[in-house]
C-alpha cells in the first residue's frame, strides 16, 4: 500500500474558475457563459412582447388599437414602433422622453425598443450557446454558423433598416398583421419583389424547403426494409433491429431521376446548409441596401413606352402603378402627422384611363 504524505496538489479555485465550473456543469438545462446573455435577454424580450400585446395601445404612436385589451386578437395585436418624431432615440425608461414614467414610456413606444434590442442580443446569445455546447462536446460549429442567417435578417430588418430611414417608426412592429403591412410597405416604397437580393432569398428559402423534403423522403425510403404487413405507415413501425440506410441506393435512385446525384453525405449536407443560410444572408444584404434607399431593377424603356402608348402594358408597368397606389395610400395613412394631401391628378390610374 502506498501512502501519500504532504499537502494536496489541488489549488483553491478563483472566482472565474468557480463560475466556469458552475456555469458549464452538466445539468438538465445547460447554462454556460452564453446563458448569461441568452436567458435574461430572451426573458425580457418575450415578457415585453406579451406585456405590449396584452395591455399597451398604439394610439399615441400610430393612431391604432394594438392590444388584447382593446379588442385585438393574436393576429392583429402588436408591439408597435415609436412615433416618427422620436427618430432614433433609444427610448430608455429613465431617458428624457419618458423621465422614469412607465406609462408614458409604453405610450411612446418604449416597449418596441426594449423588445427589439433584447431580442437581437437574445438571438446572438442562442448562437453563442450552440457554439459553446459544440465546443464542449467536440462538434464543429456549423450549427452556430447556420444561425447567423436568422440573426442577419432580424438585425437588418428591425435595426439597420430604420437606422437608414428617419427613425424607428419605419421598422416593423412586432405582430403578425403588422409584419404583413410592413411587407406591403416594402413593396410599395422599394419595389422589393423585383430586388435581386430578395430573389436570391426566395430561391434560398424555397430551395431549402425542397431539399429538406427530398432528403427526408429519401432517408425515409431507405432507412428500413419493407415488411409484409399491409400497413401504409409500416415504415414508422419497423420490425428490424437495425437500420438498413444505404447511400448507394439513394444515389442510384436520384441518378436515375435527374441524371446526377450527390457523391457523398458530407457534400449533400453541406449543400443543405449552404442554400438556406446564403439565401437569408442575401436577403439581409438587400435590406441593408434598402436602408440606404438603393433601388431595385428599373425597366425605364417599358415605363416610357407605357406612358406614350395607352395600349402597351406589361406585368412590370402594372406593378409600378400598383406601387404608386400603395405609396399614395400608405403615406397618408401611416404618417398622419405629415398632413399629406395628394391632388386627384397625381393619384395612379390605369394606362387606359
Curated annotation (Swiss-Prot):
Photosystem II (PSII) is a light-driven water:plastoquinone oxidoreductase that uses light energy to abstract electrons from H(2)O, generating O(2) and a proton gradient subsequently used for ATP formation. It consists of a core antenna complex that captures photons, and an electron transfer chain that converts photonic excitation into a charge separation. The D1/D2 (PsbA/PsbD) reaction center heterodimer binds P680, the primary electron donor of PSII as well as several subsequent electron acceptors. D2 is needed for assembly of a stable PSII complex. A plastoquinone binds at residues 215, 262. Belongs to the reaction center PufL/M/PsbA/D family. It is an enzyme of class 1 (oxidoreductase). It comes from the Eukaryota. It comes from Staurastrum punctulatum. Keywords: Acetylation, Chlorophyll, Chloroplast, Chromophore, Electron transport, Iron, Magnesium, Membrane, Metal-binding, Oxidoreductase, Phosphoprotein, Photosynthesis, Photosystem II, Plastid, Thylakoid, Transmembrane, Transmembrane helix, Transport. One of its GO terms (biological process) is photosynthetic electron transport in photosystem II. Chlorophyll a ChlzD2 binds at residue 118. Chlorophyll a PD2 binds at residue 198. Its EC number is 1.10.3.9. Pfam families: Photo_RC. This is Photosystem II D2 protein. PSII is composed of 1 copy each of membrane proteins PsbA, PsbB, PsbC, PsbD, PsbE, PsbF, PsbH, PsbI, PsbJ, PsbK, PsbL, PsbM, PsbT, PsbX, PsbY, PsbZ, Psb30/Ycf12, at least 3 peripheral proteins of the oxygen-evolving complex and a large number of cofactors. It forms dimeric complexes. Pheophytin a binds at residues 130, 143. GO terms for cellular component: chloroplast thylakoid membrane; photosystem II.
